[in-house]
Amino acid sequence: MATANNPPSGLLDPTLCEDRIFYNILEIEPRFLTSDSVFGTFQQSLTSHMRKLLGTWMFSVCQEYNLEPNVVALALNLLDRLLLIKQVSKEHFQKTGSACLLVASKLRSLTPISTSSLCYAAADSFSRQELIDQEKELLEKLAWRTEAVLATDVTSFLLLKLLGGSQHLDFWHHEVNTLITKALVDPKTGSLPASIISAAGCALLVPANVIPQDTHSGGVVPQLASILGCDVSVLQAAVEQILTSVSDFDLRILDSY
């Protein structure tokens, strides 16, 4: 359902959140892992701060054009995967991020962002044709593997496990995924497995008192760790990392961009 403040979206379908699909996601998510260790090493002209700055700009563009959280998450994943295999100069960094937004919006949005809008958002620092050429290069470098398992994809599975058929499921789904996209602006968070990021987001936002008593046992973090089959300490560390990333998130950083 669409509102003035939210992009059009459908209701969560429990059929798409069956255990077999969830376990398939857990199995293939390592294929899409990224790393923040490339900055200052393989990416000699880029720093982690520059990546965070670009990520914040990409988030703000999606917010301005009312794009879903999945678009931000996929665009950042595409960017970070590209940075693992291709050196990018400072001069082309924003154009590269814009190309990632262009591809991600085509895959994950009902109303993809236009090349004209992206050029405008970047203060016309590149032309439409230059952006299209950058999109082609991105697709070629990634061998057209443009989809990924995202943290925002896993949220629905975890919330259904926690909340069952709660009438507030869609509300928490939107809130958790918005938090996740803010955290993903930090490349350190993006290097974590998607399921861990999503579970940490759920742990930070979903209060224990909204979880049915027959499923709630020992706290939200241990319950989520049990669902994922991971150590509680691993998930707790991710919670702390995401809390740090979200605390550092500030759109005002763009004033110096």
Swiss-Prot record:
Domain of life from the UniProt record: Viruses
Keywords: Cyclin
Database matches in Pfam families: Cyclin_N, K-cyclin_vir_C
Function: Modulates host cell cycle progression and apoptotic signaling pathways by acting as a cyclin. Forms an active kinase complex with cellular CDK6 kinase. Promotes host S-phase entry of quiescent cells and activates host cyclin A. Triggers host apoptosis by inactivating host BCL2.
Assembly and oligomerization: Interacts with host CDK6.
Family that this chain belongs to: Belongs to the cyclin family.
PANTHER family: CYCLINS
Protein name as annotated: viral cyclin homolog
Name of the coding gene: ORF72
